[in-house]
């Protein structure tokens, strides 16, 4: 009887534990729901009943945090598309959703129609990047400029890096740099290389030559190291404490400012003494001498911020896309063969008197252009951009209140199976036929703030792929290694690989 009593007591105790556990879980769920509902109400209460009823579906999440944890969890788990997919699953395919991110009430625009409307409306929407990003890139850069200032600086800086004449000027240097890099990486003494790291260095050398010609190796190395830390802090939580990515990014920005200011001071001092630099004007020269219609020149902090922005964008995107395009080609032998055949045909058509490729030759590389576009779509280097509503505006039939932030999810557009069938498949042939509808292909944005260096970036990528296809192969050390998606998609081993020269004719 005693044993039976003890058994019954144990059973009752176990039952009590289950009840207690269930009560705790229910309590946590209830508290979570109450806190989320309260935060949502606080954020929208001031809008009034009529405006609240017109908001898109969604939720604000927890105070201070909002959807940031869900965003970071999705991107760090290796499934970045899960973040937007959770909104679609819970609230339907409305195209826009409300949430709370980067310390602000935010609308997520995830369809071509919604993104196009926001990007083409320069009066209704201004730049709305998070304060942390503005701090890192610079308050005088494009991410924080008014429409008029952006138009003025863009007009000044876009012409020297776009258009037939400008690109022709840079083609020879790009070609020489690519050829020398491939030969060095494929030499027996190089062994395995971090392919992405080397590509970033190569593209950085190119962009520094364009913007700051004559910069010595020490300056380039100091800048390149700092940009690595800067980029890791771009999409991180803005926690300015030792050990956090944002803390290191702030230190990197200070180093960048110091190095660029030193170069700028040297240019100004030389000009004051009447010294003239040899060679053509570079971007820094143009920024120093630029005047607006009222005769106002750019201050040093404006020049430094514009340079930080351009130098970063000019090598990060090109380096990453070049790596992924090479990897995709190597993983798809049929696509590789077709792209290589196109390059061989173009080489056969070049007159014997012509020294190297011309820009017109690159215009003939139709399939290679499709490879680049498909890589841009699949990789999504710039997966999101930011705007802020200047007034109440309706998008997809829903209200975006004045002052609210808008995130334009380019990645969601590019990976939408209703826009691109089988979106995870690398298929350059999907670009055959008419050009894509406006709003469906957004690797460089759209409208007045379209990335001014897009043509230069595509030329760099194409030059590299041309030489790689004709003479080299890539063998990855860890082809199945995990991909990290922040700040940009990359293999965790930076694509550790062996580059082998396979043709002596090239």
From Swiss-Prot:
The keyword Membrane applies. Keywords: Endoplasmic reticulum, Heme, Iron, Membrane, Metal-binding, Monooxygenase, Oxidoreductase, Transmembrane, Transmembrane helix. Belongs to the cytochrome P450 family. Its cofactor is heme. Involved in gibberellin (GA) biosynthesis. Catalyzes three successive oxidations of ent-kaurenoic acid giving gibberellin 12 (GA12), a key step in GAs biosynthesis. GAs, which are involved many processes, including stem elongation, play a central role in plant development. Required for pollen germination and elongation. It comes from Oryza sativa subsp. japonica. It catalyses: ent-kaur-16-en-19-oate + 3 reduced [NADPH--hemoprotein reductase] + 3 O2 = gibberellin A12 + 3 oxidized [NADPH--hemoprotein reductase] + 4 H2O + 4 H(+); ent-kaur-16-en-19-oate + reduced [NADPH--hemoprotein reductase] + O2 = ent-7alpha-hydroxykaur-16-en-19-oate + oxidized [NADPH--hemoprotein reductase] + H2O + H(+); ent-7alpha-hydroxykaur-16-en-19-oate + reduced [NADPH--hemoprotein reductase] + O2 = gibberellin A12 aldehyde + oxidized [NADPH--hemoprotein reductase] + 2 H2O + H(+); gibberellin A12 aldehyde + reduced [NADPH--hemoprotein reductase] + O2 = gibberellin A12 + oxidized [NADPH--hemoprotein reductase] + H2O + 2 H(+). It is a single-pass membrane protein. The lineage of its organism: Eukaryota, Viridiplantae, Streptophyta, Embryophyta, Tracheophyta. One of its GO terms (cellular component) is endoplasmic reticulum membrane. This is Ent-kaurenoic acid oxidase. The chain crosses the membrane at residues 11-31. Expressed in roots and panicles. Expressed at low levels in vegetative shoot apices, leaf sheaths, leaf blades and stems. Disruption phenotype: Severe dwarf phenotype without flower or seed development. Its EC number is 1.14.14.107. Heme binds at residue 451. It is found in: Endoplasmic reticulum membrane.
């Amino acid at each position: 009887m005693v044993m039976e009593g003890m058994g019954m007591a144990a059973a009752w105790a176990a039952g009590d534990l289950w009840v207690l556990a269930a009560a705790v879980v229910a309590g946590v769920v209830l508290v979570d729901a109450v806190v989320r509902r309260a935060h949502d109400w606080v954020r929208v209460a001031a809008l009034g009943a009529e405006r609240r009823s017109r908001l898109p579906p969604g939720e604000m999440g927890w105070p201070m945090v909002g959807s940031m944890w869900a965003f970071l969890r999705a991107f760090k788990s290796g499934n970045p598309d899960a973040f937007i997919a959770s909104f679609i699953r819970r609230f339907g395919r409305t195209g826009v959703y409300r949430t709370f991110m980067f310390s602000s009430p935010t609308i997520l625009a995830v369809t071509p129609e919604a993104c196009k409307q926001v990007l083409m409306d320069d009066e209704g929407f201004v730049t709305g990047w998070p304060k942390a990003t503005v701090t890192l890139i610079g308050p005088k850069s494009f991410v924080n400029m008014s429409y008029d200032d952006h138009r003025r600086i863009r007009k000044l800086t876009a012409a020297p890096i776009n258009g037939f004449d400008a690109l022709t000027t840079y083609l020879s240097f790009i070609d020489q740099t690519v050829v020398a890099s491939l030969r060095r990486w494929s030499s027996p003494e190089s062994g395995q290389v971090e392919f992405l790291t080397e590509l970033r260095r190569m593209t950085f050398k190119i962009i520094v030559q364009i913007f700051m010609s004559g910069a010595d190796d020490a300056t380039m190395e100091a800048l390149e190291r700092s940009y690595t830390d800067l980029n890791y802090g771009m999409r991180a939580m803005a926690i300015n404490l030792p050990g956090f990515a944002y803390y290191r990014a702030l230190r990197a920005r200070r180093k960048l400012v110091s190095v660029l200011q030193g170069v700028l001071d040297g240019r100004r001092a030389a000009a004051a003494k009447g010294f003239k630099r040899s060679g053509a004007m570079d971007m820094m020269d143009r920024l120093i001498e630029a005047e607006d219609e009222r005769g106002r020149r750019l201050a040093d902090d404006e020049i430094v911020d514009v340079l930080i922005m351009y130098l970063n964008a000019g090598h990060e995107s090109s380096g990453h896309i070049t790596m992924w395009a090479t990897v995709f080609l190597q993983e798809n032998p049929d696509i590789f063969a077709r792209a290589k055949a196109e390059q061989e045909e173009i080489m056969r058509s070049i007159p014997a008197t012509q020294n190297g490729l011309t820009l017109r030759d690159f215009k003939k590389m139709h399939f290679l252009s499709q490879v680049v576009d498909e890589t841009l779509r699949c990789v999504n280097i710039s997966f999101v951009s930011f705007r802020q509503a200047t007034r109440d505006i309706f998008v997809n039939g829903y209200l975006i209140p004045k002052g609210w932030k808008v995130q334009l999810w380019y990645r969601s557009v590019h990976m939408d199976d209703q826009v691109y069938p089988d979106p995870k498949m690398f298929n350059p042939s999907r670009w055959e036929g008419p050009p894509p509808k406006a709003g469906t292909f957004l690797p460089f944005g759209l409208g007045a703030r379209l990335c001014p260096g897009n043509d230069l970036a595509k030329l760099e990528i194409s030059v590299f792929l041309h030489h790689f296809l004709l003479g080299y192969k890539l063998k990855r050390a860890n082809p199945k290694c995990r991909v990290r998606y922040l700040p940009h998609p990359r293999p965790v081993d930076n694509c550790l690989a062996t580059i082998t020269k396979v043709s002596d004719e090239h």
